[in-house]
Structures are given as C-alpha cells and as structure tokens.
Amino acid sequence: NQTPLKAIGHNPRRRWAPMKGQILTTLRAAETVVSGETLSQAMGVSRVTVWKHIRKLQEAGYPISAGPTGYRLTGDPDALYPWEFPGREKTLHYHPRVDSTMNVARTLARAGCPHMTVVVAGCQQRGRGRLQRVWRSTEGGLYFTIVLRPELPPVLAHRANFAASLVLARTLQKLYGVPAQVKWPNDILVA
C-alpha cells in the first residue's frame, strides 16, 4: 500500500530544498510506504540517487525502514541536521562530537561565515565556559555557538548575548513548558 505522489503534496518548485530534506518531508507526510520510484520522480533524480540519500539518512540516525515496496520513516533522530532547516543549510553546522563549538565557530568566523551561523554539537570533548572554565558537555545536551556580527559597538556586544539567553529561556518556558533558567551570563540550564 503506497502513497500516491499527489497525496504527499509534490511541488516541482521546491527544487531548492536539499535532497535529504525533500526525502524527509515526503516520508513524514506519507501515511504509508513511499516507493523509490515515487521519490525519484518527485525529485527528478534516479532511484539509485534516492537510495544513496536514504542510506546517508540511515547512517545519520534516521530510522527509515526499506523494503521491496519502498521506504517509511518510523521516527526521528535527536539531532539538528542542516537539511532540517531549508534556507539555513549553509549557516547551520552540526557535528555529533567536537572539541568545542567555540573553536569551530571561531574558525568559521575567521573564514568569513555570515551573521547568525550556528555550530551545534551532540557533545563536546573540551567544552568551555567563561574564563576558559571547563563546561561538561556529555551526550544528550544541546551545545551550540552562534557567530554574531552585530552592528553594535564592541563595548555593548555582551548585552546582545545576555538578551538572547533571556529570550531563549523564556521561549522554552512559555512555548514548551520547559523549566529553563539563565545561569549568568549566558548559559541556559534545563532541569
């Protein structure tokens, strides 16, 4: 029992979306198995290309079952991959493990990455906080650094950092009911 192309909302104008994102959008919208042929026609690529992208998604932790009649997404991984954010793929960098998101962000900033580039990690091996203090960053947390290029005098830049922490904590509380607190000056702690 397969989902027909019209039922999954195929839009030929969505070619801008990365292929992994298109595959995931299609599988999430489907109520049944989606054939490789349906996916390949929707994206204008071969079934082999679809199969290769499915394999990469499986390797990244997406539980996609594959059978003789097609593919089905049975869950989602606990990760923030760039292809999950159409239009932001080039400014979101996900790493399962890094020494420090700050080190990666610094390298990207020096290379000229754009404002609001985000480096996310599943864990950090040498995470650090203010004054180079050790920051425990084990699996299961959300560790990220945002490269900002604010149009503020450097002496006021710390205010943007603190304001962002407050906004994030309040958003987690109000929209998701997550008991988040700001640990001075910019850490968000969730119980």
Feature annotation, model-predicted:
Residues 1-8:
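Extreme N-terminal basic, low-complexity initiation segments
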Residues 8-18:
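Short, Lys/Arg-enriched N-terminal segments with co-localized hydrophobic residues
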Residues 178-191:
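Catalytic palm active-site di-aspartate
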